[in-house]
Amino acid sequence: MELSLSVRVAEQLSNKRNPAMSLETLAEIALSAGYKALCMRASQLGIQTPIDEVSQKRQWLESKGLEVSMVTGDFPIPENTNLAPNALKNIGPYLDLAEALGADLLRIGMKEEDDINWAQRACDEAAERSMRLAHQCHTASLFEKVSLSLEVIHKVNRENFGIIYEPANLVQCGEEYGKDAIKALAPHTFNVYLQNLKISTDGESISHTWNRGTIRFDQVTMWGGQGIDFPLIISILKETGYNGYLTLHQSATPPTPPEEFITKTSEYLSALL
């Protein structure tokens, strides 16, 4: 397993459109902290970005020795709005973006049963270009629960369709995120997102789930001993033979500055690998 840094770290928790730093600055921090790849989002490069600019950024990243682990090509997908599934209906520009960045994995969004058919079509188009599609474990989606996630994966029934295991969203949905969940999802896990939170009745952040209603929580650092059991997660991932990326997928947690947050998280996770 190798570490990847999501450009989300330079976004606000509630605003996923405006980056707090340039891609070049973020990449330099990632390199110095030991990350091997960036997980790209539309706040830096998306389907709205001219493809020539995307190609230039890729060349620069490659010159620094950084890969792109996965691509989220628009804003509705990370914002998890009802527009998130629209990418499945016109997957071509997203595949073009991923190809220009040298990535073979795209994150997509699904909200209802009808999206399964569109996912099949998108997967077939992606397969023609040796690319994969994956959905994150996420609130207010078809992937809130492990059991439902597996049902959807089996209905899509495409080898290039899988899941992004992400324990924090499972916690918000009241799901078990440890050994049983990881092993059940293992055959379909294309990527691993890691972020930390602590459920609290007076938490500063709010999440809306389908199966538990509104949840309040606080973002906390991974190294502070609160929230999710990351040593357990990584030990089980090792047991299952997962050898993909571990992606830091969390906005910098105040009052820790982004650079310090990125570096300390890398040090913490690297010690567990």
Label every model-predicted segment.
Residues 1-100, 131, 158, 266-273:
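N-terminal pre-domain/capping segments
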Residues 9-11, 37, 71, 124-227:
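Acidic/histidine-rich catalytic cores of soluble enzymes
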Residues 12-20, 41-53, 76-86, 110-117, ...:
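Acidic-and-aromatic substrate-binding clefts and catalytic sites of carbohydrate-active enzymes
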Residues 23-30, 54-58, 91-95, 116-123, ...:
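Generic structural signal for well-ordered alpha-helices
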Residues 35, 100-103, 189, 242-243:
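A structural motif
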Residues 97-114, 135, 248:
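Active-site groove signature of glycoside hydrolases
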Residues 222, 226, 233, 246:
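H/E-rich (His + Asp/Glu) clusters that bind or coordinate divalent metals
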Residues 243-251:
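Conserved active-site loop/cleft motifs that coordinate metal ions or position small ligands
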